[in-house]
Structure formats: structure tokens, C-alpha cells
Amino acid sequence: AEGDVGRVYDGRGEIEERQLSLDDVPATSTKVMVNLANPDAALDWWRLPTDGIGLARMEFVVGEHIKAHPMALAHPDRLVDPDARRQVAELTRHYDSPAEYFVDRLASGIATLAAPWADRPVILRMSDFKTNEYAGLLGGAQFEPAEENPMLGWRGASRYYHPGYRDGFALECRAVRRVRERIGFPNVT
């Protein structure tokens, strides 16, 4: 198969196999780091001879392990959709609060990413969802504007200090602080 358009060739392809020794490869001054988003992938790639994680993206943890919009968890009382309110209550029922659910789940995911590289740097990027992606999270539609081009819209650092997301960003910061100070991974930056 090739790219977006599959091609099938008749017969067997010729494969050349060579054994290479890495013993004589000189060390470089360039750090070789991996990029990861899925905490489970950290457990697959930890044996690679890398200098750490060059980019750990938290969006996967939020989307796959938390599943709800940070503002819906920071302010579940603001949810106008009764079904979303019920789902948030169900999702977070084992926690003291929906906010604690977010902080705990995010901290756990980040710690899982960081654990195999505990002795090396883990560079974490705070959330960078596009508005349409945030809107797809539980309770997210009511907290996100409709944008013609979400790729160029309200995302990244411009979102963090905005009153419409400031409390969600505070939850992200609490999770990172927990990872660094309570769980014990000060290598996460």
C-alpha cells in the first residue's frame, strides 16, 4: 500500500537484509528524543536509546482518558444540557468533584508518559485542541465558539488566560504540579 491510495503489485518484492553494527556510531551533540501522546505508547517505546521525550502532548489523555471538556468539569453547574450534566456526574462519581476527576486522570496519564524517562527530560505541551475538537468532548459544545477555521482560531496560549478557559487551564496546571511534586516526576517541564 502507498499513501492515501493503495497499490497492489503482483508477485513478491525483493527484500535486501543487512546487519549493521551501531558500535562505531559516534555520539552526537544533538539530543534524540521521542514525541508521544498516548501514555500506553510510553510503555512500548521506553527501551529506545533516547534522551527523553521531546514533546508529550496532553490532548490524547484528555480526549481518551478524561473524555470531558475541562470547563464542564471545572463548572458542571453551568452545563445546560441535562444529558451532559448526567453523564459528567456518572463519569466523575468516584471522585470528590468533577475538577478532581480531571486533575487526577490527567496527572495519571502524564505520569505514565513520564515514568519510563524518569531520569531524562519530558517536555510537556499543555492542551492545544482546536475549538471543534474541544466541542466534541462531553459538555464541550456549550463552551466553544463556532469557528470558520479552527486551525487558526482560539487555541494554545491565547486560550489559557482567556476568561472562557482560564479555569480549565488552572486544572491542567494543578495536574502538572501533582505530577512534579506529589507523584515525583520533576523531569516533566
Which residues fall in each region the model found?
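Conformationally flexible catalytic loops at phosphate/diphosphate-handling active centers
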Residues: 1-2
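Nucleic-acid-contacting surfaces of polymerase cores and analogous helical-repeat interfaces
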Residues: 5-7
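Beta-strand/loop-dominated core regions that host nucleotide or nucleotide-derived cofactor-binding catalytic loops
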Residues: 12-13
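Conserved alpha/beta-domain cores
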Residues: 18-189
